[in-house]
Curated annotation (Swiss-Prot):
It is found in: Secreted. This is LysM domain-containing protein ARB_03438. GO terms for molecular function: chitin binding. It comes from Arthroderma benhamiae (strain ATCC MYA-4681 / CBS 112371). The LysM domains bind chitin and potentially related carbohydrates, and might be involved in damping host defense. Keywords: Chitin-binding, Glycoprotein, Repeat, Secreted, Signal, Virulence. PROSITE patterns: LYSM.
Amino acid sequence: MVSIPLILGAIILLGTRKAATAALPPRPCAFAVTAATDDTCQSLGAQWGIGMAQFLKWNPGVNCNALVAGKTYCLSAGDSELGPTASLTPSPQVPTTSRATQTMTSKASTGTLVSRSGPIKFLNGMAPDCLFYHPVSPGDTCQSIVDRYKAFTLDQFYTWNPSVGKNCESLWLGYYVCTGVKGGPNSPSQQPPSQQPPSQQSPSQQSPSQQSPSQQPPSQQPPSQQPPSQQSNTSQQTQPNVNSKCKFHIFCLGTLAYMAFD
C-alpha cells in the first residue's frame, strides 16, 4: 500500500516541474513580420506556410481574433525545425544583407524568394516628400542602389530611409525605398529646362528688324506722284498754233476758233 506522504510528494514534484516548464522564457524569435490591418493568425500562417500550432507556439498568448496592426509576430524561433535554411516563399521582410540571409535563408541572394502578395509596401519613416522609389530586389544593398542611380549619396539614402539602419541591416526584399525627394538631386525640378521651339510666326507677323533680307517682301510703295508743277510739259506741247498759256486742250481749241472768228 502506497503511503499518503509518497503520493503527496509526487504531486508536489509534478507541479513543480510544470511550473518550471511554464516559467521558461520563449526562445528568441529568428524571424518576425509586422501585421497589417486585415491580417489574422490564419492568414499569416497561410501566407508563410506556417501551421497554426507553430504560430501559437511562437506567439504565446496571442489573440487570433484581434491581431494588432503594426505589431510584430514571430514566424520562426530559435528552436524551429525550419532552421536557417528554411525557404519561406513570401518574403516581405527577408533582408538582403549577408547577415540576414544567413539568419533566414541561403536562397535570398539567388532570387528564389518572391514578394508577399498584397499592396505595395514602403519602409517606415520614409521621407514624406519622396518622389522616386526603388523596389528592393534580391542582391540589392544600400550601396548598390546608390551606385545604380548615381544621383545621390549613401548618406542621403540613409536620411531618406532611416528604417534601413545605419549599416543597411534592414533592407527588406519586396519593400520600396526612397531614391529621390522633391528638390533633390534627381527630382523633376533638377531636370534641364525644356527647349521651346523657335517662333512659328509668319514673316508678315514679324517686325522688319526680325526678318532676314531674303524674307522681307519687295517694296510695295506706289510710284511717286509728282505735283502738277513738276510734271513734264509734254501735255502742254501740243499741236502748233496752240496758245502756250492754255491749260486745257478743249479750251485752246475754243480760243483758236474764237480768234479765228475775231
